Amino acid sequence: MNRTDQLVRPNVRALVPYSSARDEYEAKDGIFLDANESPFGPLNRYPDPHQRELRAAISTLKGLPEETIFLGNGSDEVIDLCYRIFCNPGTDRALIFPPTYGMYQVSAALNDVEVIKVPLDENFDIDIPAVTPFLEDERLKLIFICSPNNPTGNSMDPGRIEFIIRNFRGVVVLDEAYADFSGRHSFIEKIGLYDNLIVMQTFSKAMGMAAARVGMAFASPDILKYFFRIKPPYNISTLNQEAALQRLRDFRPITVQTDTLIAERRRLAEKLVAIPVVEKVWPSDANFLLVKVRDADTVYDKLTGRNIIVRNRSREIAGCLRITAGTRGENDRLLDELGKINI
């Protein structure tokens, strides 16, 4: 039994996966009388349960073998499957670095997994001295790292990330949802080096397909075989697979749009610091900015009252709003309305 198998829950190791009709017969042509589908209608056939065409396109884009690619119904499904595969309910633990993406903790609660919280340091980076004692905990199975981090926007020090991967006995899940805006190297280049690393990316951010719900996980085949084993058989609809494929057929608009958003993020940061109600704007590697303002609740209410919706993060980070970089026109309207607020 290899290291990955030892980390997996015994019932998951022993699970005989559901075999769908399209697992047993993969060809596209024929008279299909095997899946109890209607013979009528434009969307009458079940989708490809393994998303072969889409995974092949992603393989070409990322330069990775198809067997190292898993697709989820959004990254939230990948997060949930991590808990289901590796954590025994009521026994095992996961670790997060708050303030960070909230679904790590929500999924843990749904799966009855205890969460250890190691707050980020004063620079919103990983506190290595604080986390190191937990790395030998035999009950700790998962560590979630978000880089660039939501809601702070910064990338974690890659050396600190790698220190955790090398020294942790369990699985490290690195969430790179915003990596396309950072200009940094992705850790997908390292999945061949580390058998305990899962890297998540998404179609929701730079690719502009949040409505389609397509999340990506990159890891060793030894890990991903369990994801394919326990996932629902048809977790990505035909419509969403086709939409993602269409988006990948011409990548130039995505690159242009990403560059535009990075430029707007920088411009927005420069303009925000001149507004009286703004106290601080943190550097960002994402498509948003963390902004400290005077009386965040009041500023939030005034902006939403003018149909400008930002995210109030003052409960997690005192006095802070998270502001997404929009179009130039949207950003100018935000700046104009924010400049009118007197507190």
What are the functions of these language-model segments?
Residues 261-262, 274-306:
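Conserved PLP-binding catalytic core of the aspartate aminotransferase-like
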Residues 1-61, 139:
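N-terminal "arm"/small-domain region of PLP-dependent enzymes with the aminotransferase-like
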Residues 196-274, 280-281:
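PLP-dependent aminotransferase class I/II
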Residues 55-93, 111:
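Phosphate-binding glycine-rich loop
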Residues 52, 88-145:
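PLP-dependent aminotransferase-like
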Residues 159, 302-306, 315-343:
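PLP-dependent enzyme catalytic core of the Aspartate aminotransferase-like
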Residues 109, 126-138, 151-172, 176-206:
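Active-site pre-lysine segment of PLP-dependent enzymes
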Residues 65-69, 90-93, 139, 176, ...:
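Short acidic capping loops at alpha-helix termini that bridge into adjacent secondary structure
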